[in-house]
Amino acid sequence: MDTNNCGVCKTIVNPGSERVKAGTSVFHAKCFVCKECKNELESFIRSKDGSLICDECDIKLNARKCFKCQLPIQSTIVTARGKSFHNDCFNCASCEKIIKGGFFFVEGEFYCSTCDAKPSDKTKTTTPPPSEIPLPGKSGVSLANGVEIQVPNNSTNIIYVLNTNESSNGLSSSGGSGNSISGSGGTNTGSSTSSFMIHKRNNSNELNVVTPTATTTVDLLTSSTTTTPTLSPSTLSPPISTARFSNDYLISLQDDIYAKQQQQLLLLQQQQIQIQQQLQQQQLEILQKNQSLLNSSSPSPSTSSTSSTSSISQSQNLNTSQPNITQQLSNLNISNQKNGEIEKYIPKINGKTLTELLKHQSFDDILGEVLSKKISIYKELSKEEVAFGDVIASGASGKVYKGIYKGRDVAIKVYSSENFCFNIEEFDREVTIMSLIDSDHPNFTRFYGANKQNKKYLFHVSELVKSGSLRDLLLDKEKPLAYFTQLSIASDIANAMKHLHSIGVIHRDLKSLNVLITEDFTAKVIDFGTSRNVDLAKQMTLNLGTSCYMSPELFKGNGYDETCDVYAFGIVLWEIIARKEPYENINSWSIPVLVAKGERPTIPADCPSEYSKLIKACWTDKPKKRPSFKEICDTLKKISESLTLKRNKK
């Protein structure tokens, strides 16, 4: 053997000496040891300085350590918020289950989407969204220091409680420690009040507070020993650090401008309630005057038959008008609240509609121009126009609240700087696309407008679909779904996607969770275009469940196009017929490997052959062989028609 230099000490290794050859290098036997533990090596890893390290020492020195258990990670690594975890250690701080879908990061803890979407504990003190104070005409009463508000006649069991941070349990209808909500004799025996919070509570006797009646005047913080504190920016809400809980969505109210707006809103509400009562009284007087005129008027001269008919008609009016006066006012009030007309808003860019612009430009070019020039094409809503309700969904970018806008139930999607994936540019993109997409299309939710007054707190308002997502429906095995209904849902989704692709919009996040189902089983596609410009690694980190719907070419670094939406639709088709989660019981981080290998969910044995063929065509490995949504719509129509013919023959 030729003479060589030692790979460690660089001195000559004599042919007759004890030596070790590894790869193309030769070592003295005494040099072929681990630099750290000094043990003889069976295998090694060369460090940056050229020294040799055994596998065990390499793991100790260089392997990533789990943020939770602090042990080296030698298998699948889960990365979130710059922290690394073992797959089994990445679990929810609330339910302690392994997080397989999206998560919510609050105060150093990770929570699964299920726990984050649950209603918060009623005993916790939280700051409500700014519009949670009811608008005029809503049941309930808004409270402020030193302000007396007559409870409206339609008041229900919703009350508001004002208490201190120091004694959240000191509420009683008969005095005691804390502040009293009753109108007689509430005594404050505690320390001076420095900050207050307004809570919405359901009158279930949890606080032993009596529900105000229609004739009750609520006077807050009446005290025999202290004067009523005045509202200021520091007393409208507690500091965020003391009020924040993992399951609550918090909005900072410490801004002086907003504090003044809220104080003005409370006073405005009192005035509007008084105006509403005056209008009702005036309407009552008008109806009574009309009745008096009918009583005093005599029938006009006419033939006997006509006079008889006229008299009968007037008699009927006299007999029925008086008992219905209150009912008419009630119906008028309900109509104004629940059936408010919302005028359709048609966005225009430089005076032209989308249809006109698409004749000469692509949708991407139009969208790029709007975003680059910061052209606002959506209807701008004020906070005062919207009332917030309960949380109905949550994710990395924010939460979705149930709310009321112009008397209609709506969904309010809120983005806040407190959220993990807060991005103003993405918000602008989403509301711009939602404004441009035809809201009259039966398979999209109607978009009403957005608010960007506070750059750290953004929201947009759209139609509320109360029945929930397609995913929820499919996983609820107690709700039977006929094959014809399944075909109808699939056709609705395909029609929505066909429209998007026809104007050049790629969804990029089509999945059962982004499809809402109405009470008559109409499917409405939501969240289109929101994931554009998000790289693959970030998208998988933010929303792990999305990997089930991602086509194999995406994991190879190829870009998004229409065929990626078709692949995702194939997975949704499978979900509709199988009524299961795709890749069930498989770790989300392992799914890309399975997809790249060509593995797909198992199609049920009882799946109709035509439907099965369509699924396979949509999720084929070769993008060019996947059908367009126009072809998919035609195929589903033929399947439905053949099913109808078979029914008629029977």
UniProtKB/Swiss-Prot annotation:
Family: Belongs to the protein kinase superfamily. TKL Ser/Thr protein kinase family.
A GO cellular component annotation in the UniProt record: cytoplasm
Designated name of the protein: Probable LIM domain-containing serine/threonine-protein kinase DDB_G0287001
Protein kinase domain boundaries: 386-643
PROSITE patterns (UniProt xref): LIM_DOMAIN_1, LIM_DOMAIN_2, PROTEIN_KINASE_DOM, PROTEIN_KINASE_ST
Gene Ontology biological-process entries: signal transduction
Enzyme class, spelled out: transferase
Catalytic activity reported: L-seryl-[protein] + ATP = O-phospho-L-seryl-[protein] + ADP + H(+); L-threonyl-[protein] + ATP = O-phospho-L-threonyl-[protein] + ADP + H(+)
Region Disordered, residue ranges: 118-138, 171-197, 293-320
MF GO annotations: ATP binding; metal ion binding; protein kinase activity; protein serine kinase activity; protein serine/threonine kinase activity
Residue ranges of every copy of the LIM zinc-binding domain listed in the record: 4-63, 64-122
Binding site for ATP: 392-400, 413
SMART domains recorded: LIM (SM00132), S_TKc (SM00220)
Keywords, alphabetical: ATP-binding, Kinase, LIM domain, Metal-binding, Nucleotide-binding, Repeat, Serine/threonine-protein kinase, Transferase, Zinc
Compositionally biased region (Gly residues): 173-188
Active site: 509 (proton acceptor)
A Pfam family the protein falls into: LIM
Enzyme Commission number, as recorded: 2.7.11.1
Highest taxon of the lineage: Eukaryota
